[in-house]
Amino acid sequence: MVVVGKSEVRNVSMSRPKKKSLIAILSTCVLFFLVFIIGAKFQYVSVFSKFLDDRGDNESLQLLNDIEFTRLGLTPREPVIIKDVKTGKERKLHGRFLHITDIHPDPYYVEGSSIDAVCHTGKPSKKKDVAPKFGKAMSGCDSPVILMEETLRWIKENLRDKIDFVIWTGDNIRHDNDRKHPRTEAQIFDMNNIVADKMTELFSAGNEEDPRDFDVSVIPSLGNNDVFPHNMFALGPTLQTREYYRIWKNFVPQQQQRTFDRSASFLTEVIPGKLAVLSINTLYLFKANPLVDNCNSKKEPGYQLLLWFGYVLEELRSRGMKVWLSGHVPPIAKNFDQSCYDKFTLWTHEYRDIIIGGLYGHMNIDHFIPTDGKKARKSLLKAMEQSTRVQQGEDSNEEDEETELNRILDHAMAAKEVFLMGAKPSNKEAYMNTVRDTYYRKVWNKLERVDEKNVENEKKKKEKKDKKKKKPITRKELIERYSIVNIGGSVIPTFNPSFRIWEYNITDIVNDSNFAVSEYKPWDEFFESLNKIMEDSLLEDEMDSSNIEVGINREKMGEKKNKKKKKNDKTMPIEMPDKYELGPAYVPQLFTPTRFVQFYADLEKINQELHNSFVESKDIFRYEIEYTSDEKPYSMDSLTVGSYLDLAGRLYENKPAWEKYVEWSFASSGYKDD
C-alpha cells in the first residue's frame, strides 16, 4: 500500500495542478533570488518575507526561512515551545542569544566635524579628518547616536525573532574626553535611561499591565563609564545603585531590589528553573576603582560581591540550574586586584558543574582568555601564608610598605589604561602578542605534554623513579583546571562595530513537569535570607556558620600548635565535590554552546556607499557576517573549554592562523600598531 501511495505521488506530481504549484515555487525562487541579491545590500528580505506570509505559501515560506538563516550564518532549527508551570505562560526557545557591549552613544557627535576635536566641533583640516555619519573606526571618537539607533534597528529586523535573551554588558555613555563638554552624573543617568528605554521597546512583549514581560529577556550590567566619576563606584546603598535600579526596573527582578541596592548585581532566570544569567558588578573587583583595595577585608566591596556570588552559585547548584556569568570588566589578571582575580577565578573553577561561561566587554577587542583555577588556589594559599607571617611579625614593615606602593602603582596604571580606552587605539597588537606569548603558549605547552595513550604508564614510571617529581596529567584533568573568559568586540568604533550571536544546545528541552520549581524555596525567600547574611557580614567580625540558611561549606586551614586558628574566609570556595559531574562548559549536553556568528559593520564601506548614493542611510547601513566559530582558523566543532584550549594551541603554533585571528580581533578594521 505504501508503494502504491508512492507511485500515486509520483504520478500526481506530473499532473497539471502540481505543475502549476511547481511553477509557482520556481517563480518564487527566482523572485526571491533577485530580491535576496538586492536585500543582501539593502536589507529588503524582511519585506519579502511579509509578502510571502500574506500569500500563505508554506513551501515558499520554509524555503525563505532556510535562506534567511543561511544569509545570517545561523543554524536553521525548529523552535521549542516551553511552558512555565507557575505562570502558565508559553514561549518559544530558539537556542540562540545576543551579546552586545560598549555602545558609547555620544549626543555631541556632529557629522562633518573634526575628528581631531573628538567629532564634536571644528572645521576638518583635511579629508581624513572629517567625521562621517556613522562614525569612523580607529578615530578615537565615540558612537554617533545614529550608529546606536541603526544597530538596534538592524537587530530588530534581522535577529529579534530568532533569539532567546540578550546579554548587554555596559558602557552606554560617551567617554569623558572633551574638556568643553565635561560629563555630569545627570547626563550619565539620562543617556543610560535612553538606551534602557530603547532596549525595552525593542525586546519587550508590549504588555502595558506588566512592563517586566519580555519576549526576549535583557540582562544589563554596569560599565566603568556608566558611573561618576568614571571607574569609581562605592558599595551600596548609594544614589547610584538606587538610580540604576530605577533605570533598569524592568530588567531587575523585583524581589532582588535590596541586594541590587547593595551590589548592583542580580540574577535572571532566562529559562525558569533551568537556565540563569548573573549580572555581576565587576567594578567592585576592578583595580582602576580607587575604592577597591583587595577582596580580603569584609568591608571591601569586592569581598561583599564575592560573598553574594558564592551564595547565589550554591543556590543555583542546589536547584540543578546552569548559569552564564556576565559583566563589563573581564576577570583577567590585567584588570582585577590580585586577590579579587584569584578568588573570582577560583569560584568559576569550583562551580564548573553549573557555570557555562563568562561574557564581558570593556576592552573593545574580540578575543578569549583561559584562566587557571588550580593556579588561582595556589596563589591564594601562598598569599594567606604570607599574611599570617606579617601578622605574627615575621616579615618586616618594609615589605608591607612595598606592597602598598605596588598597589598604588597598580591603581594608577589601570586608571591610565582605562582613560586611553576612550582615545584612538594604540599598542593593541602588542597586547594581543602578550596574550599569545603568555596564555596561549602556556596552554600549548601543557597540551604538548599530555599524551593520553601513555600517560598511565608514565605515571607509574614517575612514581617509581622519583615520587617528588610532578606526575603527568590527563587531558581531562588539564581541561578541568581552566575556564574561558570571552571578551566581546564593541559597538563603539574603536575598531568596526560588532556583536555576537551565540547558539546553544536545546535538544533535550521538553515541555514537562521538570519546569516546576515549587519544591525549592521561592526566590524572594532566598534573597531575603541572603540580604540578612550580607548585612550581618558587615556588622559582625565573624558570622556563626550555624545561622547560615543558604549553606556553603567553607574550607578550613590547619595551623601549628600554640597558634591561633585562622578564621575561615567565606569568599573562598571549597573544592567541587566528586559527586558533581562536569557541566555544559566541558561536556556536550543541554545548554552547551555549540557555535557563534560574529557580525560587524564595515564603516568605511558603508560611509563610502552613503557618499556615492542617493539611497536613504537606513537602506545602506547593515551588519555582515565577519566569521563563524566553525570556519578557519577557529574550526571548532563545539564551544567547550577543551575546544578553546585546542584553538589556543593552534593560534600559538600557527602563524597564518594567528594573523587571521588578530585581524578579526580588531573587527576587520585593518588596525596595526604605529
Swiss-Prot record:
GO-annotated molecular function: endopolyphosphatase activity; exopolyphosphatase activity; metal ion binding
Cofactor remark from the record: Divalent metal cations. Exopolyphosphatase activity is predominant in the presence of Co(2+), while endopolyphosphatase activity is predominant in the presence of Mg(2+). Co(2+) is more effective than Mn(2+) for dATP phosphohydrolase activity. The yeast vacuole plays an important role in Zn(2+) storing and sequestering. Therefore, the changes in Zn(2+) concentration may regulate the enzyme's activity.
Post-translational modification: Processing by proteases in the vacuole is required for activation.
Pfam families: Metallophos (PF00149)
Broad class of where this protein is predominantly found: membrane
Superkingdom, natural source: Eukaryota
EC number: 3.6.1.10, 3.6.1.-, 3.6.1.11
Cross-link (Glycyl lysine isopeptide (Lys-Gly) (interchain with G-Cter in ubiquitin)): K6
Domain notes: The transmembrane domain contains polar residues that mediate the recognition by TUL1.
Quaternary structure (record): Homotetramer. Interacts with PPN2.
Additional remarks: Inactivation of PPN1 leads to the inhibition of expression of both exopolyphosphatase PPX1 and high-molecular-mass exopolyphosphatase not encoded by PPX1. Present with 319 molecules/cell in log phase SD medium.
Protein's name according to its UniProt entry: Endopolyphosphatase
Organism: Saccharomyces cerevisiae (strain ATCC 204508 / S288c) (Baker's yeast)
